Amino acid sequence: MKEGIHPDYHEITAKCSCGHVFVTRSTGKDLNLDVCSECHPFYTGKQKVLDTGGRIDRFKKRFAVLGGKN
């Protein structure tokens, strides 16, 4: 490999707003994150499930007159 053509690849810290800190390597500067795998609802299992059942029932009732499958 040629000398002097590669960017400076060094350790950085990525700090989340929840307090979790990751150490990784990059050519950039330290990162401040809003969410991470420790606090994001998808990864923690605390997801909100949207109530779409009411919308589906309304759709079925509205278009039941057309005589489609039940």
From Swiss-Prot:
GO terms (molecular function) for this protein are:
metal ion binding; rRNA binding; structural constituent of ribosome
State its cofactor: Zn(2+)
Q: Which family does it belong to?
A: Belongs to the bacterial ribosomal protein bL31 family. Type A subfamily.
**Zinc found in the keyword field:** yes
Residues annotated as binding Zn(2+) are 16, 18, 36, 39
Q: Which InterPro entries does the annotation name?
A: Ribosomal_bL28/bL31-like_sf, Ribosomal_bL31, Ribosomal_bL31_A, Ribosomal_bL31_sf
Q: Which domain of life is it from?
A: Bacteria
Gene encoding the protein:
rpmE
Instruction: Please give the name of this protein.
Output: Large ribosomal subunit protein bL31
HAMAP family recorded = Ribosomal_bL31_1 (MF_00501)
Q: Which UniProt keywords apply?
A: Metal-binding, Ribonucleoprotein, Ribosomal protein, RNA-binding, rRNA-binding, Zinc
Q: Which GO terms describe its cellular component?
A: ribonucleoprotein complex; ribosome
Subunit structure as annotated in this protein's UniProt entry:
Part of the 50S ribosomal subunit.
Q: What does this protein do?
A: Binds the 23S rRNA.
Q: Which organism is it from?
A: Tolumonas auensis (strain DSM 9187 / NBRC 110442 / TA 4)
Entry's cofactor comment: Binds 1 zinc ion per subunit.
Kindly indicate whether the keyword rRNA-binding belongs to this entry: yes
- Gene3D superfamilies assigned to the protein according to its UniProt record, in alphabetical order: Ribosomal protein L31
